[in-house]
Amino acid sequence: MATNRNSRIDSKEFVEQFLSELKAILESDTFVIERDLDILHKKRNESATDPYTTTNTMAALEFDANDVCEELKAITVEDYAETMLDDRNEAAPPFFVFYRNIQTRYVYIKVKIRDRATGKVFCVSFHFARYPKPSPLPYEG
């Protein structure tokens, strides 16, 4: 079930297509993590002590950008929660939301392919789930 009017549940095939494209980009010989994977570490109004920020989650997991990239490659359709429109630009590619169990905790991941032609990926969220994971997820089990 989508969480708000800016979100939707895409078909399993559509999500699988997105994941296939994402994995192809991340595994491409031309993909350079430092240049092509944009991870938003802190949102404007987040507190530095908030355990649910991307920065603090990555620190708690002892992750760097390479580890985030590996987790993005490992996402499956069963991890899918919803698709969200980019509220800054509705014409831009949407974000796909996933929940992954990493080191016994659910991590909320919100990612999009920013530019397919140049292989740019934008991970706007990679943090411990602030709220319980919806259960079941659309294609879980």
Please place each PLM-identified region on the residue numbering:
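Phenylalanine-focused residue identity feature
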Residues: 14, 18, 31, 63, ...
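Functional cores of ribonucleases/endoribonucleases
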Residues: 73-120
